[in-house]
Amino acid sequence: MTEHWENLNALTAPLLTWYDLNGRTLPWRSVVTPYRTWVSEIMLQQTRVSAVIPYFERFMAELPDAAALATVPEERLLKLWEGLGYYSRARNLQKAAKVIVSDFGGELPRTCASLKTLPGIGDYTAAAIASINFGEPVAAVDGNLLRVAARVSGCADDIMDAKVRKQFTAHLNDAIDLARPGAYNQAMMDLGATVCLPNGAPKCEICPARMMCEAYKNGLTEILPVRAKKKARKIEERTVLLLFQNSKAALRKRADTGLLASLWEFPSVLGNLDEAGVSLALAQMGLSAQTVEPTGSAKHIFTHIEWDMKGYFADVTGENDDLFWADAAAFDAAAIPTAFKKFAALVRARLQ
């Protein structure tokens, strides 16, 4: 199938007209600053807009600028981020904030190229900030823009391929509205998020690109964009130990690097243990189980791995230097990953 990249240029004017009437009302758009755009774009990575909004508003209330972000204790930062996942995003935000304060007078740099020198800011985020806040005509190419562009142009190349993405970026940069580059990027984002939906479910009847869209004209909306299949996730069974001693619950700090780095977790062991297995595992930790009670199961999906978890309450005696015994106040202050959300609720209820 022949690509029709000129369709992207033809889409620009009707797209902006559509956006002026149908653009989403979002808190980072109601008050626009480089800092707010930056934080929102980092939060929106791998996370739905509806889930981000309350986190964004809480974050802004406590950390309204780069100076506040640069100096907040990491434990508090991770607590504010708790539930959003991908915690390296929060750490990179703070690393970048420290550079912004020390090297840029507390204000984000004004060009796409200089923004990309900051920790955690890649091509997409830099382009979003530079176009929305500083008027730089550079396309912010994410999954939404790739999907719209693939369908409108009829390009059947794999959008996961780096060379193909580079090609898309060049054509989108050519199509961007020079007078309103930020609006163009936000319009394409909104079109992809609300109309040109993934998984063969676009709302073509209300799409401003319908008359110039190769996928619509040729019945290819279920096929485009072409995306290479991901590798199957590894499934890992874990037994989560909800341990209590003297009206306190056990938490353990994860390693400084890797998955969920430096966050608090419940002690756990690999495998799907029964009650006898739990007692043995506790003995190997230097603890003696007084009671062991199953609490149900939970599942959490990461990008490349899936945890199938089975939980147990256990009242224990003994000591283990890797464990921190938290009362209700300390437990509420600890940053605990969403993976343990179900178990955290059970522990919190028991600590009250």
What are these regions (language model features)?
Residues 1-25, 30, 193-352:
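Intrinsically disordered, low-complexity, charged terminal extensions of DNA damage-control enzymes
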Residues 3-9, 13-205, 209-222, 287-288:
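Catalytic cores of DNA base-excision repair glycosylases
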